[in-house]
A protein has these predicted regions:
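Extended, Lys/Arg-rich, non-catalytic nucleic-acid recognition/anchoring regions
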Residues: 167
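Structural beta-strand/beta-sheet cores of well-ordered domains, especially the beta-sheet scaffolds
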Residues: 80-83, 113, 140, 181
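Non-catalytic DNA-recognition/assembly elements of restriction-modification systems
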Residues: 1-93, 190-203
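A short beta-sheet element
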Residues: 97-161
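Beta-strand elements of modular eukaryotic interaction domains
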Residues: 72-74, 106, 174
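Short, flexible loop/turn elements at secondary-structure junctions
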Residues: 89, 121, 148, 187-189
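A short glycine-rich beta-alpha junction/loop motif
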Residues: 2-3, 135-142, 172-197, 201
């Protein structure tokens, strides 16, 4: 049953509906039903078949570069000009502009097969992708650097897992900073995903 169809007593029957109920007793019962351990964010959670960890357990989070003062053009002038990536609900539309790689520090430019997350935009937050070439992320994109060696297939798996957490966020509750870092994801790639031909899922 969804919220719009939830049945509640009408105003005239409200008094009879709550008659005999104790607020203190109800609060006590609610507290007793809580599992405090489950409410605490854990670094690692172990389920029946899968072990989970926070995003920051597996990745180092790197914020993108603000567009202020950056020289951007709408086309690739030559090989020195690389995509400046913005949030998007599709990877094909995530190129905001092209920027000259010589204007950035080496650690501000990320290589092909880098995992990144959109952290802003009502229709684009939380969507995650693996880059198809060198790029510079804008300030509404977070780059994820694996803390262990990962294959391309593993990065695509984690991009899918992160995107599946989209329902937890909104334009008013953006997946930035600690909120993004605390997303729970599997520690290892599932066997089902491992059996997929990676070339069938690359956009």
């Amino acid at each position: 049953m969804t919220l719009p169809y939830l049945q509640v007593p009408c105003l005239e029957d409200a008094e009879e509906f709550v008659k005999g109920l104790s607020i203190q007793k109800t609060k006590k019962q609610m507290i007793q039903r809580l599992n405090i351990k489950e409410l605490k964010e854990q670094t690692r959670l172990k389920g029946n078949k899968m072990e989970f960890a926070s995003l920051s357990y597996l990745f180092e989070l790197k914020n993108g570069i603000a567009s202020t003062g950056i020289d951007r053009i709408p086309y690739k002038r030559n090989e020195n000009w690389i995509p400046y990536i913005r949030p998007s609900y599709r990877q094909s539309t995530s190129i905001d502009a092209y920027v000259n790689r010589n204007m950035f520090m080496d650690d501000e430019i990320y290589p092909k097969n880098t995992l990144y997350v959109s952290t802003n935009g009502q229709g684009s937050h939380t969507f995650s992708y693996v880059s198809v070439g060198d790029f510079v992320p804008n300030s509404d994109v977070t780059v994820l650097i694996p803390k262990r060696v990962m294959t391309l297939k593993e990065k695509l798996f984690y991009a899918m897992c992160i995107t599946h957490n989209r329902f937890k966020f909104s334009y008013g509750r953006k997946p930035k900073g600690q909120k993004l870092a605390e997303i729970l994801i599997p520690i290892r790639m599932t066997e089902k995903f491992d059996n997929i031909n990676v070339y069938n899922i690359i956009i």
